[in-house]
């Protein structure tokens, strides 16, 4: 069952934590890939120095964040890679959740071909570990690109659905790659499923 709009229209931290264990799905050209969300980061917009919309910054790139909750915000980094966020809160409040890592469920052969141009059984241990354990890696594996920016997650192409009813421990950690964000770099707004092998960066004790 797909997540309804009201799921996303809540406090961003709550949405981030509750996205763990849910299933990200992308259906394109008759090919379905999916994966359990195992790591996320929350970004709280105007007052968050780590966020793209800090200080009320509003550009064509960040416009999706100002739109209705339950839409995709997909952006390009380093001139090479895409990252996918889920827009949260209410329209006009530019907050979102970065999907950092997934555990593949469906279409793993397709993911392998997209990431490494190899059959899944031919992947090295390193490639297996790095199939979807990062925001740009999962976008490459699931073919999430600029075309999916602003996409309604209540549609039939890119969406998130309920996962299995399972219990797990959530780890709270610092977000990755925002050392410029002054005090915001220390916020424990990265959340991941403890013990999952697909998490990108483990918390240092």
UniProtKB/Swiss-Prot annotation:
Name of the protein: Putative 3-methyladenine DNA glycosylase
Top-level enzyme category: hydrolase
Cystine residue pairs: none
PANTHER family tied to this protein: DNA-3-METHYLADENINE GLYCOSYLASE (PTHR10429:SF0)
EC number(s) reported in the record: 3.2.2.-
GO MF term (any one): alkylbase DNA N-glycosylase activity
Family under the similarity heading: Belongs to the DNA glycosylase MPG family.
Biological process, per Gene Ontology: base-excision repair
NCBIfam families in alphabetical order: 3mg, PRK00802.1-1, PRK00802.1-3
A Pfam match: Pur_DNA_glyco
Alphabetical list of InterPro entries matching this protein: Formyl_transferase-like_C_sf, MPG, MPG_sf
Keyword line: DNA damage, DNA repair, Hydrolase
Organism from which the protein derives: Clostridium acetobutylicum (strain ATCC 824 / DSM 792 / JCM 1419 / IAM 19013 / LMG 5710 / NBRC 13948 / NRRL B-527 / VKM B-1787 / 2291 / W)
SUPFAM superfamilies: FMT C-terminal domain-like
